[in-house]
Amino acid sequence: VQTCALPISNMLSVAERHKYILDHLNKYGFVRITDVANELGVTKVTIRKDVKILEAKGLLYKVHGSARSANPHVADTDVHVKGNVNREEKERIARKAVELLNDNDSIIMASGSTIYAFAEAIKREFRSHLNVVTTFLKTSVLLNDVEEINVVQLGGCVHKKSLSAIGGYAEAALSDFSCSKLFFGVDGIDLEHGITTSTIEEAKLTQVMMRSASKIIILADSSKFGQRGFGRICSLEEIDVIVTEIGRASCRER
């Protein structure tokens, strides 16, 4: 007697497929179209149609090749509030990022809660000479206490939520520096929309920072993937390294 396994899809109606997708979103917050198609034994075209219907009903948000249960467009949020989100993950990412530093490095550090966690890790763990150029007031104050670190605080208008100097003064000053590495955080990493942040001003400033550094490094926790900010910084192809956490903190180098 021969037996065969029938695909789950043979037993699922459209409504049941939709429930399957929504149940996974409620549990994990994120699903890949390819994974759902394989699990249900249907084509990716079928799942894309299902996702499109569910998005039209306001039940999920479609991003490139996947769907999320939350709106992928992020708002400008106070840096102190961000600091309490995924704190342990950011600390692990920060410790991994310290491993990328070399003695006598000259680096640019942007603003953000993950960058501040990086600054804290530098103060605890890095014992060599370092030159730091930053727009972030909190980083300047923290690292200025370290004997081996020279801090250059860039001027400009202080953005109230990010505590970062922004605008023409900061951008003009950056042109005077040639640094080995840029470390910056982001609000969104998306295959289709690239690297984004929540404001146009921060995006423009980061673009100028990129032109003043040889190696471009993003520090981002897992919540930033599939998200989109209002201001586009660059494409993924322009990034050299992403330090993130998938199970544990790791470096993904292009």
Which residues does each predicted region cover?
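Short, small-residue-biased leader/transition segments that mark boundaries at the very start
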Residues: 1-6, 253-254
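Conserved SAM-binding loop
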Residues: 107-108, 132, 198
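Catalytic core of membrane glycerolipid acyltransferases/transacylases, capturing the structured
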Residues: 121-141
